[in-house]
């Protein structure tokens, strides 16, 4: 029986109501965090002389036993509502209510669950960052391998300008690097303690909130008690980061699907990330990229669901907040799985250099550089040069001739001239790439510089990550030793 019901409500409760309202199914995500929270709170109660040292030692010793045995060994009775009451009931069963019943002094499940969520989520955020750093390292290796691999870039999925495949990979690395930065920023706002806020108005007991903050490795306090129990903005912020990263990863999946098709044929996805057809024996389908793309799309829905649950809730705690958790954890695991899939596909992709080069050499991808050359060499306005090259492309298509065959005629008509050497250079796609050596450009030496810069950032991120992992591992070790 739920020990909370024996007073105000009585013991009668409908079974379907219990099953409908329990959170035990997804409380496994906060089990360890709840134990850590209980130990920290109990330690502080002893230090503040709120409970006796003898009772505190008994409670903490039993909590450590529960942690060691694991959640699966507990009586997960849905009538107990949640993992907090399951653990407290287990303590009472082993120690008696006069001892175990003192653990919850000065605390509510409201500040308890808010603390647990922050403890668990900070660990998951570091796990996400770990996978992202691994993926970025692997992508940087691919970029470095192909810093001189000529290909064509697209706008509107129409061939645009020559680039290198290494530069194309760097475009995704650049976006993901910002995602890593966002997760680190969010971590600092997750890692704040609401413990001690009580139900919503703190407590009359002489608690030391800064002590539990220290014991649990939080960077600071959520000071206002009403905000402390009601705020889930740290979850929304994390899920927004997840959704943004999911969008960035979905673009990679889309490129894997499109560019591996026979029509493009510039890359080939490794066999282990593909499947075949049940009827068409020739097929090699990019199933993993497609499924990953679809799963990443669900992240937006999870975020909107959480925002909708939170919208216009009365201030402080409402049980609606319980329904946020499953959407959070589903998003986290979907993202982690997806990162690993994208990492695997990019790391093992085969590049068709000849096809990439062929695409870069046709469909007028060098037209922009030809216009730029007219500006530099002939001193005309870019808009005029744009019009002249546009006319060249139009005639080339209509007359089915190469630009080289008609350029002298068109230039002469416009009282302009250009040496054959300048024309050849302007129309050479790799020369186009080499010329674009400004910061962020596709020139091989600039790609190499960018790779070095990203490697330095990744090293700094890894150092920061290792420090944070060590901090939370130290908390666990100190509380459970």
Swiss-Prot record:
Q: Any idea which UniProt keywords this protein has?
A: Amino-acid biosynthesis, Arginine biosynthesis, Cytoplasm, Lyase
Which Gene3D superfamilies does this UniProt record tie to the protein? Answer: Fumarase/aspartase (C-terminal domain), Fumarase/aspartase (Central domain), Fumarase/aspartase (N-terminal domain)
Catalytic activities? 2-(N(omega)-L-arginino)succinate = fumarate + L-arginine
Give any Gene Ontology cellular component. Answer: cytosol
Q: Which InterPro entries match?
A: Arg_succ_lyase_C, Argininosuccinate_lyase, Fumarase/histidase_N, Fumarate_lyase_fam, Fumarate_lyase_N, L-Aspartase-like
What enzyme category does the UniProt record give? lyase
Pathway listed for it? Amino-acid biosynthesis; L-arginine biosynthesis; L-arginine from L-ornithine and carbamoyl phosphate: step 3/3
Mention one GO biological process in which this protein takes part, according to its record: L-arginine biosynthetic process
Q: What is its main location?
A: cytoplasm
Q: Where in the cell is it found?
A: Cytoplasm
One example of the protein's molecular function in GO is: argininosuccinate lyase activity
Which positions form S-S bridges? none
Q: What is its EC number?
A: 4.3.2.1
Family, according to the entry, reads as follows: Belongs to the lyase 1 family. Argininosuccinate lyase subfamily.
Report the protein name in the record.
Argininosuccinate lyase
What is the species listed in this Swiss-Prot or TrEMBL entry? Methanococcus maripaludis (strain C5 / ATCC BAA-1333)
Q: Organism classification, top ranks?
A: Archaea, Methanobacteriati, Methanobacteriota, Methanomada group, Methanococci
> What's the encoding gene here?
argH
